[in-house]
């Protein structure tokens, strides 16, 4: 009787522990070249996207939002739900609905953080001077572009700026906005990235335009004659120091001190604080006063 033919066994390859085709090989190279080739491009990208605004005064997230609202017809039309704007903006900005809505809030009239807001808002958009006053969800609020945005998009359809592909190459978006005034100096802007941060204060729109026209006529124009000092939101008093102002204008670096405004209500025997510096919040000030009272450094305060 013929014997059954044996099937040859396949050779068993050694276990690779998930390493395929040399994926686990160690490549040695100088740390300097590694940083130059990988880290430096990343650092430059986030610095230009987060820390330093472009010449039009906007970061990419701002520009993508405003351009989306412009394409939606919100420059002249009625307000629409903020959720609609956020959803449309995600075609240009893939960072998620929460980040987009936060950007819209900070550009809105209701948030009160800008001298000249770009978003005409309706509903609860919180307040920049309150840490605990949260804004409503995007499904409850409405928005459109403010009238000043006419000066941001003027002649944008006449090849005044370059257009680039969005993140998935399905749409075009402007690399800059054709602003008709120095918006980078009109509204305050802050940002932080890799090893670099910026905190640009705001200036009066009329004074900025007059100064720009004067510099065009005379490059040696003394800026301080038409632009004496920054103009901050909230209406605080500036503690003017000519040396500091000169340093800010000449180097772009320096600090300007602000003082809150108040009035004494004699009938109620209380102090009414009318405005506070834009770099702090009501809650921070209240907590600081409470600490001073507990330490015995401030007395005769019964309520706050």
Predicted regions and their residues:
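Gly/Lys-enriched N-terminal cap/neck module of very large, oligomeric protein machines
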Residues: 255-304
């Amino acid at each position: 009787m013929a014997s059954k033919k044996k099937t040859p066994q396949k050779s068993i390859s050694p276990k690779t522990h998930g390493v395929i085709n040399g994926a686990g090989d160690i490549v040695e190279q100088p740390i300097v070249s590694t940083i130059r080739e990988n880290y430096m491009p990343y650092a430059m990208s986030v610095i230009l996207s987060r820390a330093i605004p472009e010449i039009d005064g906007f970061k990419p997230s701002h520009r993508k939002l405003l351009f989306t609202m412009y394409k939606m017809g919100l420059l002249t039309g009625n307000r629409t739900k903020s959720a609609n704007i956020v959803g449309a903006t995600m075609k240009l900005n893939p960072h998620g609905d929460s980040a987009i809505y936060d950007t819209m809030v900070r550009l809105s009239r209701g948030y009160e953080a800008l001298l000249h807001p770009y978003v005409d808002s309706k509903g609860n958009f919180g307040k920049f001077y309150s840490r605990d006053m949260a804004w409503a969800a995007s499904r409850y609020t409405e928005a459109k572009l403010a009238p000043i945005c006419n000066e941001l998009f003027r002649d944008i359809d006449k090849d005044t700026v370059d257009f680039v592909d969005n993140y998935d190459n399905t749409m075009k978006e402007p690399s800059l906005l054709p602003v008709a005034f120095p918006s980078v100096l009109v509204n305050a802007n802050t940002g932080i990235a890799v090893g670099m941060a910026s905190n640009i204060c705001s200036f009066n729109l009329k004074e900025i335009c007059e100064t720009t026209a004067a510099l065009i006529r005379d490059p040696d124009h003394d800026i301080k004659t038409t632009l004496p000092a920054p103009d901050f939101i909230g209406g605080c008093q500036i503690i003017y120091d000519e040396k500091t102002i000169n340093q800010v204008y000449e180097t772009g670096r320096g600090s300007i001190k602000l003082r809150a405004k108040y009035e004494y209500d004699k009938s109620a025997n209380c102090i009414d604080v009318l405005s506070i510096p834009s770099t702090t919040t009501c809650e921070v000030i209240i907590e600081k006063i409470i600490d001073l009272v507990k330490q015995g450094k401030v007395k005769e305060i019964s309520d706050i």
